[in-house]
Amino acid sequence: ERRPEDARAKLVAESNVLREVKRWPEAHAVLVGANQRFPSDTDLLYEQAMMAEKLARTDEMERVLRQVIELKPDHHHAYNALGYSLAERNVRLPEARELIRKALEMAPGDPFITDSMGWVEFRLGNHSAALAHLQRAYASRPDTEIAAHLGEVLWAMGQREEARRIWREGRSRDADNEVLRETLTRLQVR
């Protein structure tokens, strides 16, 4: 490809195809190569970070997301992804909340960022704040992963039947959702 935009488009298409068929190591390798060629392309860097996360390369994911934020300080997806990852791993929760707060400032009302805020509040032990965020996120977008989080908060608060109802809704939309499956297994819910 003589034109850089053509080369970039080809690399993006290749990584997308590999990701669709769940060949994550190969998709990751394509993105690493793409980022060597286009080192300041924040969209490619963000995609590399997401593939690194799929491969449990959390150090790489965190480093690359911080690079994205440095290059593009208004990249709310990078703030959210980094904050959510910290919350999911239950580490550096005050930092996670601050990253997610910044993402919400940039994209107020985004249901996925609102979900992340609910999740970090839950990890911090703030169940009522978590519930408020997660109910708002779920009302805005009844996504299966949001259902998993909302159900877990309801479960922890003793609202077991409501949790089961939310999980059933989530399962009816996406029975194979990894986050929901893991949540139900961990909490030993049938």
Question: What is each PLM-predicted segment?
Answer:
Residues 2-5, 37-38, 71, 106, ...:
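Structural marker of alpha-solenoid helical repeat scaffolds
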Residues 20, 54-55, 88-89, 123, ...:
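Register position in tetratricopeptide repeats
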Residues 6-7, 16, 41, 50, 75, 84-85, 110, 119, ...:
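Residue-level recognition of tetratricopeptide repeat
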